């Protein structure tokens, strides 16, 4: 089982010491995973979308932890929450956000390596990520749900992901 105990990831009830791979790059080979393992890394923070399904199998096999990230990145739309600003705060986009978050969850939920889910990457916070958080928490009872750009707002579980943080 995976949980969150006072901001620290817990695996089967025991705190997990985490060290995140600093730069994932665009592709990951089995030899890269083994090299990262030798260097003491055990956590991969995936980018938004476009990750090969074999990566999850490799991480399962080699004992890496993974934070799965939904394929949402609205960084090109700016960070404005005003009307006409970022789509994250536009209710017209809510169904699309929920669909992407849910698809990301259902695609990866059975991989033991997936220890947390991230709502989006580089997007303004707003109603669609609030609703996405609530929706995902309704589906996932144990693993943390994160949004690194939440800025201390309630739609991200508090979790330290690396000793360097």
Regions found by a protein language model. Name each.
Residues 1-38, 57:
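N-terminal carbohydrate-binding accessory modules
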Residues 29-31, 43-165:
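Substrate-binding/catalytic cleft of secreted carbohydrate-active enzymes
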């Amino acid at each position: 089982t995976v949980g969150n105990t006072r901001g620290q990831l817990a695996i089967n009830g025991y705190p997990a010491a985490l060290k995140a791979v600093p730069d994932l790059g665009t592709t990951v080979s089995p030899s890269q995973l083994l090299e990262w393992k030798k260097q003491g890394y055990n956590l991969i923070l995936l980018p938004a979308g476009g990750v090969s399904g074999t990566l999850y199998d490799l991480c399962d096999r080699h004992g890496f932890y993974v934070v799965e990230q939904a394929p949402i990145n609205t960084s090109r739309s700016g960070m404005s929450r005003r009307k006409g600003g970022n789509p994250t705060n536009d209710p017209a986009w809510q169904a699309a956000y929920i669909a992407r978050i849910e698809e990301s969850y259902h695609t990866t939920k059975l991989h033991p390596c997936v220890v947390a889910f991230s709502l989006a990457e580089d997007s303004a916070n707003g109603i669609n990520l609030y609703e996405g958080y609530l929706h995902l928490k309704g589906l996932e009872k144990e693993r943390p749900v994160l949004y690194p750009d939440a800025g201390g707002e309630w739609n991200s579980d508090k979790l330290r992901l690396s000793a360097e943080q």
